[in-house]
């Protein structure tokens, strides 16, 4: 899951070296904390949150493959 999210996010941002992921996995849940450079925050969130919504949808559906619930937190 980490590699999947990292690959997608790095394709969106200018400062790839500042993409940070922290993945906490329990028996039924995967929590992914995402941090990017301040300049790239708008690209990750998108207009009216559409990009963030799309990223969360991808993560949610990818986690369903393992019958888990996924939460993507975009932190500043």
Regions found by a protein language model. Give the residues of each.
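RNA-contacting regions in translation and RNA-metabolism proteins
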Residues: 1-43, 54-76
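Glycine-centered tight-turn and secondary-structure capping sites
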Residues: 45-49
